[in-house]
Amino acid sequence: MVAAKKTKKSLESINSRLQLVMKSGKYVLGYKQTLKMIRQGKAKLVILANNCPALRKSEIEYYAMLAKTGVHHYSGNNIELGTACGKYYRVCTLAIIDPGDSDIIRSMPEQTGEK
């Protein structure tokens, strides 16, 4: 019971931080652009939906590991991630280039353990 409440609270805080990034920061949505930003070394944090295809997920994790970029596994599916970003379409992957006023990058490292 307590764990469910904690995950809901952390999900809400992630969603509010994501909305702040969408308003004040720079980001790219989608697999191809995310991969491009990781390879260029511009991505500060990558967020993946939980129903992202395994091959895409492993490829992004591999490139992020090479570029020493943090990867956060979003607890919702791609529809919920798109809604959290304020979009009316599905978002499987997104890369945050500049967080703007949000402290999303500082708040993530405790949740994104490098494997």
Swiss-Prot record:
Similarity comment: family membership: Belongs to the eukaryotic ribosomal protein eL30 family.
Glycyl lysine isopeptide (Lys-Gly) (interchain with G-Cter in SUMO2) cross-link, chain position(s): 26
GO biological process assignments: antimicrobial humoral immune response mediated by antimicrobial peptide; cytoplasmic translation; defense response to Gram-negative bacterium; killing of cells of another organism; translation
Subcellular locations according to the entry: Cytoplasm
InterPro entries associated with the record: Ribosomal_eL30, Ribosomal_eL30-like, Ribosomal_eL30-like_sf, Ribosomal_eL30_CS, Ribosomal_eL8/eL30/eS12/Gad45
Role, per record: Component of the large ribosomal subunit. The ribosome is a large ribonucleoprotein complex responsible for the synthesis of proteins in the cell.
Positions bearing N6-acetyllysine: 26
Sample GO molecular function, one term: structural constituent of ribosome
Main location class: cytoplasm
NCBIfam families, per the entry: PRK01018.1
HAMAP family for this protein: Ribosomal_eL30
Keywords for this protein: Acetylation, Cytoplasm, Isopeptide bond, Phosphoprotein, Ribonucleoprotein, Ribosomal protein, Ubl conjugation
Protein's name according to its UniProt entry: Large ribosomal subunit protein eL30
Quaternary assembly: Component of the large ribosomal subunit.
Record PTM Phosphoserine, positions in chain: 10, 16
Organism classification: Eukaryota, Metazoa, Chordata, Craniata, Vertebrata
Domain of life: Eukaryota
Annotated GO CC locations: cytoplasm; cytosol; cytosolic large ribosomal subunit; cytosolic ribosome; extracellular exosome; focal adhesion; membrane; nucleus
